[in-house]
């Protein structure tokens, strides 16, 4: 979704620009739904004051939900592999938070920003340093486990307190 927010910003939050630059590339039968979807996102971005920067509340809520689950998983002795993946990624998370000057930023937001940053580098065909690749590998592994547990939690298949 962060990419969608950026795509909307790149098109100046203007439905006409999105139509010309994005929507016309899709099959005709999908365009009406896309117009409505992007229109709703533009409205939300305007109402929430994130037209220039920041993230929609729905995206922030996902981070909050993931953080809640992360805290439950990491405080439970039932998930040692999850804790190990987290502690393997933690030095990279701390380093990234220090580098970006956002020491108070939630850890998971830092992780997603790192992944998104690498995605943007790859899209621009820019090199990724060995250190960054190593950090992203650890962070990706950690987030992959969290995503798996999140999916199980949403399906009510995750037993945290048994």
Task: Give the predicted meaning of each segment.
Residues 7-10, 28, 43-51, 68-76, ...:
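Amphipathic alpha-helical interaction surfaces
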Residues 20-21, 60, 87, 133:
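Short, charged, amphipathic alpha-helical segments
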Residues 38-41, 63-66, 139:
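Short amphipathic alpha-helical coiled-coil/interface segments
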Residues 47-71, 154-162:
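Charged low-complexity stretches with an acidic bias
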Residues 56-115:
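A charged, amphipathic interaction segment
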């Amino acid at each position: 979704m962060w990419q969608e927010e950026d795509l909307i910003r790149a098109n100046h939050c203007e439905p006409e620009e999105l139509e010309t630059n994005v929507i016309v590339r899709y099959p005709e039968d999908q365009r009406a739904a896309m117009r409505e979807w992007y229109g709703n996102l533009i409205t939300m971005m305007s109402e929430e004051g994130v037209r220039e920067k920041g993230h929609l509340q729905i995206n922030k809520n996902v981070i909050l939900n993931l953080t809640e689950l992360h805290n439950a998983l990491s405080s439970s002795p039932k998930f040692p592999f999850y804790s190990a993946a987290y502690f393997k990624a933690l030095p990279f998370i701390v380093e990234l938070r220090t580098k970006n000057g956002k020491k108070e930023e939630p850890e998971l937001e830092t992780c997603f920003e790192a992944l998104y940053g690498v995605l943007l580098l790859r899209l621009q065909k820019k090199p990724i340093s060995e250190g960054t690749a190593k950090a992203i590998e650890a962070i990706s592994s950690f987030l992959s486990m969290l995503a798996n547990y999140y999916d199980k939690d949403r399906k009510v298949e995750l037993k945290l307190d048994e």
